[in-house]
Amino acid sequence: MLSKLASLQTVAALRRGLRTSVASATSVATKKTEQGPPSSEYIFERESKYGAHNYHPLPVALERGKGIYMWDVEGRQYFDFLSAYGAVSQGHCHPKIIEAMKSQVDKLTLTSRAFYNNVLGEYEEYITKLFNYNKVLPMNTGVEAGETACKLARRWGYTVKGIQKYKAKIVFAVGNFWGRTLSAVSSSTDPTSYDGFGPFMPGFETIPYNDLPALERALQDPNVAAFMVEPIQGEAGVIVPDPGYLTGVRELCTRHQVLFIADEIQTGLARTGRWLAVDHENVRPDIVLLGKALSGGLYPVSAVLCDDDIMLTIKPGEHGSTYGGNPLGCRIAIAALEVLEEEHLAENADKMGAILRKELMKLPSDVVTAVRGKGLLNAIVIRETKDCDAWKVCLRLRDNGLLAKPTHGDIIRLAPPLVIKEDEIRESVEIINKTILSF
């Protein structure tokens, strides 16, 4: 009886505490409303208090975007030179993609793959004909596309190449980045990604990037099913391989009966001045991964493209996703691809990128030690001192009206939306130059 009474008293106390908490929260919310919209500082503090600390954002609180620009909650305007890591290549809130989303969202958004829908086949036909592959497997995020490619490679290795079951290997390049799932970090050579998350996926090996002799040695192993590589390494710091590297990869993979998987999640879809970055060397990978700009930044959409001899090794029930291939995502992806085609954004990226790099090369070499990139995927390398590093440069760029983000310490990635015009490139370069000269 006493224990029951104690329990009742505890419950009553908890209820009183809950009412107090709710009242307090309501009071804070009311006070916040009375004070007007949240400030940047309030937004920073709220995220820090309630969200996981798995990112280190540049301190700017954004509320609106259009084309190549974004605005913070105080109304300040910025050039966007990150494009959500390339996802908003078509520009923020592109009207055609927005309209496609609106037209579909009132009709049907999700069926799962338990049933057919009337948009998936239209999208599959469009994207496979556009890139000249037999089949597409629709997923949502870039890392899901990478996982899909690994499963396809292993299954193909067992059923087509004849690798002993569960002995298949996939080779990756040092500096690779394709996500943060356990499989992705198992292939990583960056301690920030993998340290403390083992044990790791077996059957993954790494070799130096841009090193054809190393690849040839690795492919001597008959258990290698695939080599997965970024045509330009993005997260590693926009590392552009030597001319002929991708041609050599294609030749070696063909010679050793190994699948060439091109991770075009960041480099593909016109970003480097071609539809795919591999197009610079006119090579055709066995598997192509697409994502990011495949939806124009409106919705997570990714895709894995390959031919029947690879894709059809996976049977019904062996791989999939509840949201992959949903009608909303498919309608958005069609529109996003049409924008790239209709607005000739690959050509614009090629032209604007050349202007950008030419102007960046004029920056003082005592601060900027290197400029590299293709199309509108570029980077500058900052000489670190006690007063100057990539993070400090990005903070000052923000203050001057341009948003960019460091990658790997001393490197700043510069990747604006592909709709940027020449006068906007030159205005952006003036901001970058002014910022660099201030150090």
From Swiss-Prot:
| Sites bearing N6-acetyllysine, chain numbering | 49, 66, 107, 362, 386, 392, 405, 421
Instruction: Identify the EC number(s).
Output: 2.6.1.13
N6-succinyllysine PTM positions: 102, 107, 362, 405
Q: In which tissues is it expressed?
A: Expressed in the head and flagellum of epididymal sperm but not in testicular sperm (at protein level).
CDD domains linked to this entry: OAT_like
Q: What is this protein called?
A: Ornithine aminotransferase, mitochondrial
Q: What does this protein do?
A: Catalyzes the reversible interconversion of L-ornithine and 2-oxoglutarate to L-glutamate semialdehyde and L-glutamate.
Q: Tell me the Gene Ontology biological-process terms attached to this UniProt entry.
A: arginine catabolic process to glutamate; arginine catabolic process to proline via ornithine; L-proline biosynthetic process; ornithine metabolic process
Entry similarity comment: Belongs to the class-III pyridoxal-phosphate-dependent aminotransferase family.
Gene (name only) = Oat
Record keywords: Acetylation, Aminotransferase, Mitochondrion, Pyridoxal phosphate, Transferase, Transit peptide
